[in-house]
A protein has these predicted regions:
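Short catalytic micro-motifs in class I SAM-dependent methyltransferases
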Residues: 10-13
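Conserved Class I S-adenosyl-L-methionine
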Residues: 80-155
Length: 155
């Protein structure tokens, strides 16, 4: 390998093949090189997921890899785990439309099988707003991002 450090921030949750990602990182890292990642894990957008579950049976929130899956993929690629910690980060909004605009603004989209293929109608959106209101605290709507921070070494 020829690279001392690889840094990936909130990108690998979009990878279709996590073992291949880690294998490629291991291949390009110098011996002793370091990979630093942050990625989303289960617990992310639980409020939104639960609110949608009261509206319909479609899958609206991405399924994220468990910490153990990330760890196993890195180890199987020959990387040594230096540290892995997942931390909840809560962002709050005045209105659900603000959360939805943030998600759209960062380019987040539903990657799941079983996702709804149609447009969101006004009636469903009103039901979603009503079900998300159950999470309102101190006049704000929370959105939890469960972020995994990982550090790995090559060799």
């Amino acid at each position: 390998g020829s690279v001392d450090l690889i840094y990936s921030s909130l990108a690998i949750q979009w990878c279709q093949n996590l073992p291949q990602f880690f294998a490629e990182c291991q291949r390009v890292l110098k011996p002793g090189g370091c990979l630093q990642i942050s990625t989303l894990v289960p617990g992310t957008l639980t409020e939104l997921n639960s609110a949608w579950a009261l509206v319909d049976d479609a899958v609206h929130v991405n399924a994220f890899d468990e910490l153990g899956v990330v760890k196993a993929a890195a180890k199987s690629a020959g990387l040594k785990v230096s540290s892995l910690v997942d931390v909840p980060h809560v962002v709050s909004y005045l209105k659900l439309k603000d959360l939805m605009a943030d998600l759209k603004g960062i380019g987040a989209h539903n990657m799941n099988q079983g996702r709804s293929q149609g447009l969101l109608g006004k009636s469903k959106y009103q039901k979603l707003i009503a079900s998300y209101e159950a999470y309102r605290v101190d006049d704000r709507l929370p959105a939890t991002y469960q972020v995994l921070y990982g550090s790995f070494n090559n060799g």
